[in-house]
């Protein structure tokens, strides 16, 4: 159970503590932030409302701890990460329980997120040893006009203090995808979890604490964005920001100055369906891609662009599958669970009502109870409808009928987003050409968009992000190249 057993230190009465300098603390503010259960719409947990002064102390401790950590042998860093991964997986049940109650994640998916997170940390440890254990040697006579009298030795060194800000929908997995690379690379890390998902993140951080990482190396501060949000992202002690979320990331990027940024900011992932596609495969992937976790995924299918000739058939197949989805509370392993907040549900409803006023075809009756919205497919959506462009982050999916591939590509590329997309066709040549034409960070062929496997590159174009994620890319992003040049008194040549 959350906050009990090995996690008892995380809880102070009814309020979860924040983590600083190797210990769990109550904030001097005396204030708390409520976490509302999306299903019951009642306060489920409370976390500390940290102050700016507490953030300053966390940053000071992180800076000191990082200097020592950078001198820790690479194998030792990896060893501790493996230990944290094992502890995380061992205690998956209470963490998954928090995910169910904080963000209404279906129980089976909540457990999977924790296990996947442990696997990610272990892989990061192995990958870090591989890529950080290698250097590079350059010799001067490979560039015109130079003799062989200079040797350049280059290696990767840490950036310093990494600020990690994960989103509510994967508060554990998208936290460790930042924590693991930062730590193996020799950085310290300050985590600011989302409010919804903070308790699961705090439990995850305790697993790193139990693994024995040095004091001050990892910190986790909770609180109101209005109080510590900008203060964190603009803090002079931060040397790198890794953020996953929405429009807030654009604001951060404008304020971050010279700090390296890694950002994933959402998408309007397009699914282009050609006449020659396997229509059963298409329908299965539209349902999986568009409605898993109630559509609250950055890589969810968010608009279907389908050739008119096969549209009726696919819509019929999708509707048949939607009718079989289980709608209800996450504890029952429902397929469709409540969206995370009432404001999210209201936003989704606004998109639905706009589509209704403008003549979209409702394949199901629109139904909502509190934060719970039943799955809805909207056919005959036109570009003048908001849902054609805006990201609902809910179980509502628009279908736009097209008469040419070019029309589909044009709609995809007219979006200000460019995270992922997918194309369904049996013609691999067409698939590759369409992929090349789509302005998306990743294009899936004959499968719905997906973030994983976690070692694959993951990046967005346009307003969908800055930089690339994935384990290898994240490690490289959280380091900088350091070169040492050896100047010889005279040219050196190989034997012979």
From Swiss-Prot:
Describe how its activity is regulated.
Insensitive to magnesium or calcium when dephosphorylated. When phosphorylated, 3-fold activation by magnesium or calcium, 2-fold activation by potassium, inhibited by ADP and AMP and insensitive to ATP or PPi.
Segments passing through the bilayer:
none
Residue sites binding substrate per the record: 116, 169-170, 297-299, 451
Q: Which GO terms describe its molecular function?
A: glyceraldehyde-3-phosphate dehydrogenase (NADP+) (non-phosphorylating) activity; lactaldehyde dehydrogenase (NAD+) activity
Q: Is NADP there in the keyword field? A: yes
EC number(s) reported in the record: 1.2.1.9
Keyword field contains Phosphoprotein:
yes
Q: Which reaction does it catalyse?
A: D-glyceraldehyde 3-phosphate + NADP(+) + H2O = (2R)-3-phosphoglycerate + NADPH + 2 H(+)
Q: Fill in the PTM field for this protein.
A: Phosphorylated in shoots and non-photosynthetic tissues, but not in leaves.
Pfam families in UniProt: Aldedh (PF00171)
Q: What is its main location?
A: cytoplasm
Q: What does the entry list as the binding residues for NADP(+)?
A: 192, 195, 230, 391
> Which positions in this protein are listed as binding NAD(+)?
245-249
Keywords of this protein's UniProt record, alphabetized?
Answer: Cytoplasm, NADP, Oxidoreductase, Phosphoprotein
The GO cellular component terms are: cytoplasm
In chain numbering, where does the site feature Transition state stabilizer fall?
169
Q: Which residues form the active site?
A: 264, 298
InterPro entries found in the cross-reference section: Ald_DH/histidinol_DH, Ald_DH_C, Ald_DH_CS_CYS, Ald_DH_CS_GLU, Ald_DH_N, Aldehyde_DH_dom, ALDH-related_metabolic_enz
Q: What does this protein do?
A: Important as a means of generating NADPH for biosynthetic reactions.
Family assignment from sequence similarity: Belongs to the aldehyde dehydrogenase family.
Q: Subunit comment for this entry? A: Interacts with 14-3-3 protein when phosphorylated. This interaction is released by divalent cations.
Q: What is this protein called?
A: NADP-dependent glyceraldehyde-3-phosphate dehydrogenase
